[in-house]
């Protein structure tokens, strides 16, 4: 049974900051498994490019929501919310504290705050919009979105065709503005939530990210990306590390440039993560090495 005597510890931070090592120490202190909050580690075909926990690390501490789905599978933050809450019901029967760790902002919010109950669009509406996009580009779709949902139009990234199309397909399928489904209050959870954020100075983090990309290449990222190249159209592969390698395979850039772009885009993603996390005043921030002892004390 979940009660306020049970605690979900959320270890979060940007890519490359050092969450994995500290998460293992925290989980061992708690004596419980780790729940991954990484929207790409959930796909079994992508262990290298997503820096998924190794078999040795998973043998040391069980990990949930790692390698459980194929990139061919549809998976969403809403599905993740439901499945994690079900898993926590069982885990809290055995453990007073459980660790959730990752850097996927939407997945963390899904568990901690809940996400909006947005209806699925009609398949024929989605197909028609994607056909329009392929034939005409995004301008006409943007104009229609602006007419039907000016609030969402004002804040959506208008270069991201998937988000633009998603907003319009919900408008057309439901007869309501997509923005009208967005809630602003968090759902209540029957357990305490303690958020632990990890940070490093920007220069230090960038060096770690660049080095990690080189390490991924040595581990076989190129071969991993080639194996899923025939599936490049899937949303799961619209991901840093893979889309750059696909450009290399297409012949539009060389291998060295692909690596540089992975490093650059990983640094950009880390900045976006920190921008998102800084909006949450409930996060307590720590350095993963200098403050390690304080963090471990916090979870005991």
Swiss-Prot record:
Annotated GO biological process: tRNA modification
Transit peptide found in the keyword field: no
SUPFAM superfamilies recorded: P-loop containing nucleoside triphosphate hydrolases
Domain of life of the native organism: Bacteria
Keyword Magnesium: yes
Alphabetic keyword roster: ATP-binding, Magnesium, Nucleotide-binding, Transferase, tRNA processing
Enzymatic class: transferase
Cofactor: Mg(2+)
Site (Interaction with substrate tRNA): residue numbering on this chain: 104, 126
InterPro entries attached to this UniProt entry: Dimethylallyltransferase, IPT, P-loop_NTPase
Segments for region (Interaction with substrate tRNA): 38-41
Binding-site residues, substrate: 15-20
Reactions catalysed: adenosine(37) in tRNA + dimethylallyl diphosphate = N(6)-dimethylallyladenosine(37) in tRNA + diphosphate
Record: residues binding ATP: 13-20
Gene Ontology molecular functions: ATP binding; tRNA dimethylallyltransferase activity
EC number(s) per entry: 2.5.1.75
PANTHER family assigned: TRNA DIMETHYLALLYLTRANSFERASE
NCBIfam families xrefs: miaA (TIGR00174)
Assembly behavior: Monomer.
Annotated family: Belongs to the IPP transferase family.
Function text: Catalyzes the transfer of a dimethylallyl group onto the adenine at position 37 in tRNAs that read codons beginning with uridine, leading to the formation of N6-(dimethylallyl)adenosine (i(6)A).
UniProt name for this protein: tRNA dimethylallyltransferase 1
């Amino acid at each position: 049974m979940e009660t306020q005597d049970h605690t979900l510890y959320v270890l979060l931070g940007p890519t490359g900051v050092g969450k994995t090592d500290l998460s293992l120490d925290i989980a061992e202190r708690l004596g419980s498994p780790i729940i991954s909050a990484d929207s790409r580690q959930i796909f079994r075909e992508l262990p290298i490019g997503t820096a998924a926990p190794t078999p040795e690390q998973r043998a040391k501490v069980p990990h949930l929501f790692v390698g459980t789905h194929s990139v061919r599978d549809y998976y969403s933050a809403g599905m993740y919310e439901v499945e994690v809450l079900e898993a926590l019901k069982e885990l809290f029967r055995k453990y007073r504290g459980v660790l959730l760790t990752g850097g996927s902002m939407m997945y963390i919010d899904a568990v901690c705050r809940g996400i909006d109950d947005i209806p699925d669009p009609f398949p024929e509406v989605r197909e028609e919009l994607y056909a329009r996009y392929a034939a005409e580009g995004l301008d006409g779709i943007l104009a229609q979105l602006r007419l039907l949902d000016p609030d969402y139009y004002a804040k959506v990234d208008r270069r991201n065709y998937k988000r633009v199309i998603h907003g319009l397909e919900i408008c057309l399928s439901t007869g309501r503005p997509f923005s009208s489904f967005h809630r602003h209050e968090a759902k209540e959870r029957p357990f305490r939530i303690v958020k632990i954020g990890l940070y490093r100075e920007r220069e230090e983090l960038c060096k770690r990210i660049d080095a990690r990309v080189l390490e991924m290449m040595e581990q076989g990222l190129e071969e991993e990306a080639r194996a899923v190249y025939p599936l490049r159209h899937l949303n799961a592969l619209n991901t840093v590390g893979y889309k750059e390698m696909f450009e290399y395979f297409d012949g539009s850039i060389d291998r060295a440039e692909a690596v540089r772009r992975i490093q650059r885009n990983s640094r950009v993603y880390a900045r976006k993560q920190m921008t998102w996390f800084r909006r949450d005043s409930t996060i307590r921030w720590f350095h993963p090495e200098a403050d390690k002892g304080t963090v471990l004390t916090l979870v005991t």
